[in-house]
Amino acid sequence: MSLHDQFLAVRDDLRSCLLERESAIDNALLALLSGEHMLILGPPGVAKSMLVRAVTARIDGACYFEKLLTPFTVPEELYGPVDLVGYADRGEYKRIGTGSLATAHLAFLDEIWKANSAILNTLLTISNERLLHEVGMPPQHVPLLSLFAASNETPQDASLRALDDRFLLREIVVYVQED
């Protein structure tokens, strides 16, 4: 089976699983193929998370990270805890990032606009330059291919415009209409 045929098979399989989500599926696959990011907007219960999980689950060998963001989300939840033993023994300030956003190829951040400014600011360089900047640490390359984000609302604060602009692909999903 050619690569093109495999791609169409994945797309058709996703379309059979997720009703009335053809455009969202196509945009999610385009995000993966182009290495860009996608924002999915819609009310609760329209399968935004399900869509991202279904698409990313079909990528073999990719490190996947997912997090529901809140105003209380701290950097350790996204980038891993500080290596306290390394800090105590050698004075090295670094994170244990295995399984975190810092090591992910694909990531899904749900309710992105609910995160606090500290989190949102670090996402600016991760989403654009694929670098994690933290005080006291050299910039760390992040192997991120595509970042998917979802929200029930559009950002109202003008300070969020820069991060919002990082999502070149956007999809507004609504409740399924067919019986």
Q: Where in the sequence are the language-model features?
A:
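Pre-Walker A (pre-P-loop) alpha-helix and adjacent loop at the N terminus of AAA/AAA+ ATPase modules
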Residues: H4-P43
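Helical mechanochemical/support elements of P-loop NTPase systems and associated helical scaffolds
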Residues: Q6, V10, R21-A24, L51, ...
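Conserved alpha-helical scaffold flanking the Walker A/P-loop in AAA+ ATPase domains
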Residues: N27-L30, L84-A107
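Walker A/P-loop
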Residues: L29-P71
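Canonical AAA+ ATPase core
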Residues: E66, V85-R90, L106-T122, S127-D179
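Conserved NTP-binding/hydrolysis module of P-loop NTPases
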Residues: F72-D89
